[in-house]
């Protein structure tokens, strides 16, 4: 029996989606598709869609949904997506979700990683980075041997602007505004029998969340 693993991941920045996406990819051998990577690849390859996207991006304009969906369809028609794929960061809006559905892409699972805002702020504002190497630490979960210093070089660690609490809160506000309608949309789709919707507690240990995913996806 052919398994189908067409999955959408929902979750705020810092909710642990990336870690679990890696787990799903390794376990089921399906690729993760991020629209950012797709645009970069299409632009690099000089495809027709890539050229259109580049022209818009160069003018600082947003790429319209039709173009993004066309790019997604193009990407998921590749052989490595035969058994499924993980969509991360798309769809972001109801029109994108509708366009995806209208283009005949049936989603098997929607997985939402739920983490309270205050936990995300703690996770992200505790990050420290060694700029030259990209090595990252966390003051609570993965502290450096010497406070504020890189383990290898002993150089100073920095807080990325993106990880400052006020920036994180701004990003979370945008995320909730954009994503709550999608949560409602896919829960309604699940109620109609068109997909399966699961909300996972992202505050649990990584291994626990992975085990839960394993039993959901089988």
Curated annotation (Swiss-Prot):
Pathway entry: Purine metabolism; AMP biosynthesis via salvage pathway; AMP from ADP: step 1/1
Catalyses which reaction(s): AMP + ATP = 2 ADP
Pfam annotation, one family: ADK_lid
This enzyme's EC code(s): 2.7.4.3
Annotated localization: Cytoplasm
InterPro entries documented for this protein: Adenyl_kin_sub (IPR006259), Adenylat/UMP-CMP_kin (IPR000850), Adenylat_kinase_CS (IPR033690), Adenylate_kinase_lid-dom (IPR007862), P-loop_NTPase (IPR027417)
Listed SUPFAM superfamilies: P-loop containing nucleoside triphosphate hydrolases (SSF52540)
GO MF assignments: adenylate kinase activity; ATP binding
Stretches for region NMP: 34-63
GO terms (BP aspect): AMP salvage
Record's subunit section: Monomer.
Protein name: Adenylate kinase
Gene giving rise to this polypeptide: adk
